[in-house]
Amino acid sequence: MQNNKDNYLKFTKMDKKSIRAPYDQNDLSKKIQRIKKREDIFLLYKINNIITEHTLLQPKQRILIAVSGGQDSICLLRILFDLQRKWSWKLGIIHCDHRWNSRSKIQAEHVACLAINLQINYHEGIAIESVQKESIARLWRYNVIQSVAISNNYTAIITGHNASDRIETLLYNLMRGSGLHGLQSIKWKRNLCFSHFTRSVLSKIKFSFLVKKLKFIKTFMDHEDFQGNHFFFLKKRKQLHLIRPFLETTRTEIRNILTIWNFPSWPDVSNKELRIRRNRIRHRVIPYIRIHYNPNIDQTLVRWAEIVQSETFYLEQLTNYILFKIEIKKKISSISLKIPLEQLRKQKEPSEEKLNFYQSAIPVDLLRSLPVAIQRRVLKQYIYINTNRILGFQYIEQIRLSCLFSLQDSLRKFLHRHRCRPIYLSEHISTHSMKSSTSDTCIDWKGPKEKKKLVTPWLIFPGGIKFLIRKNYLFIFSPKNSSLTIKRPRIEQ
């Protein structure tokens, strides 16, 4: 019996060894390859679902891909190339050479070789002079991409911004003190903001003017030589969108996919320079938080940015709806006040006849009935519509307090809260606060001595923007023209 047990144990040991040997060499490698293939397919499936869920792209669309040569843009190019058969896209590649170093030319040749191998149209923009500042280089890069997209009839521009870039932008804006609009960081899809030349010159060329000058304008648009490149029409410019489908994919996932594909990429040397703030956030702040506070900080911040973006979109739509209702109630399309600026400056209290021209003003009673967050957004959007300028939080809060309380109370409360120097002045008063935290607000009166009340019709802000609170209405004056103009709010669909 003992011999039988020993033989059985020997047999089982030999049998296990015989089973393990081929499994360690062949089956394990096949299993690893299977996992890699699944990870590859999973990323394609993920990007395809993101495009469908957020309606980023449409079938048979002309797409321009911004490829810098780094791992993000190279991975994006490969994924869109694999999805091209399903969606029937017409792809194009654009590369911008900033001439920051001597290797930029080799990097451009590397991207051009990829375009040739994939048989995709290639466009390249080269800077005449090397730009050292990142902000100026970014503006130049976007202007080049927009001009190429408009002239070649592309309807979408895709960049390789990923979840890691979104987290870095969120933390950077948080340290700067941005609001919800800055905390949502990078959006999935947005309309491109065109250059000053496009907004000021090209938008003035209207179709009706061309019909009068060119009787053959209808055949001119459909001519084969132009191939639909009507870059001067506003309809074409409104169709151009900037899309980022990688906002849920981290930089480590992209790096792993490129190692699986064995696809060449060109790393950006400037990403390692710690003198740049974003690089310090990338290499020092985020790893420190990941080690000492939350190892899953990337997923947490991405989820937070998505929540902030959806709630910000709701608040923006609600604000536009309120402004639209104010406009419908007043039945105003566009009104101009034909009174010279000098006459308005001389008057301390405008007459009721002149105030009737300000029919698109915001009712103060309506503003008081809204929540505080909506009050600030309505004021900020209303000011931007009429003056094309964005005021900071302290100025918006100042106007809001002036609407809710009397001018004197709001002035004292605001200066006592912020302990700051004068922010708004008038023709008769100037205000300032003392350095001591316990002292009261000091008010210097420069007007006639017999008047003791702190009453002035105008609130003057930086840039010459003036506000008037009169008859329970808030009126606005923009210094661009010599007369008061009121524009119709632009409601986004």
From Swiss-Prot:
InterPro entries found in the cross-reference section: Rossmann-like_a/b/a_fold (IPR014729), TilS/TtcA_N (IPR011063), tRNA_Ile_lys_synt (IPR012094), tRNA_Ile_lys_synt_N (IPR012795)
GO cellular component terms attached to this protein's record: chloroplast
Residue pairs linked by disulfide bridges in the UniProt entry: none
Catalytic activities: cytidine(34) in tRNA(Ile2) + L-lysine + ATP = lysidine(34) in tRNA(Ile2) + AMP + diphosphate + H(+)
Keyword Repeat: no
UniProt keyword ATP-binding present: yes
Places the protein is found: Plastid, Chloroplast
Keywords for the protein's UniProt record, in alphabetical order: ATP-binding, Chloroplast, Ligase, Nucleotide-binding, Plastid, tRNA processing
UniProt record, GO biological process: tRNA modification
Residues annotated as binding ATP: 68-73
Primary enzyme class: ligase
The family this protein is said to belong to: Belongs to the tRNA(Ile)-lysidine synthase family.
Note on domains (UniProt): The N-terminal region contains the highly conserved SGGXDS motif, predicted to be a P-loop motif involved in ATP binding.
PANTHER family: TRNA(ILE)-LYSIDINE SYNTHASE-RELATED
Task of the protein: Ligates lysine onto the cytidine present at position 34 of the AUA codon-specific tRNA(Ile) that contains the anticodon CAU, in an ATP-dependent manner. Cytidine is converted to lysidine, thus changing the amino acid specificity of the tRNA from methionine to isoleucine.
Name of protein: tRNA(Ile)-lysidine synthase, chloroplastic
Lineage: Eukaryota, Viridiplantae, Streptophyta, Zygnematophyceae, Zygnematophycidae
Gene from which the chain derives: tilS
